[in-house]
């Protein structure tokens, strides 16, 4: 299946949001995931299966001052 992640169209295996984050080395990081214009709560990352054509934005929080 193909999904667009942060503006880049990628071919992905069947997976959940949690699987995608793990594959990208983002597990445990402070971040927000938007799927097709809707925020995916962290509690739903493991239950949210990606579908062909999904558009995701993954934003990682960066501390500093």
Label every model-predicted segment.
Residues 1-64:
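Ubiquitin-like/PB1-type beta-grasp interaction modules and other compact soluble beta-rich domains
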């Amino acid at each position: 299946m193909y999904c667009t992640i942060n503006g880049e169209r990628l071919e992905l295996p069947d997976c959940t949001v949690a699987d995608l984050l793990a594959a990208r080395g983002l597990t445990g990081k402070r971040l927000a995931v938007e799927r097709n214009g809707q925020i995916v709560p962290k509690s739903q990352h493991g239950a949210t299966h990606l579908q062909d054509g999904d558009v995701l934005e993954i934003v990682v929080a960066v501390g500093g001052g």
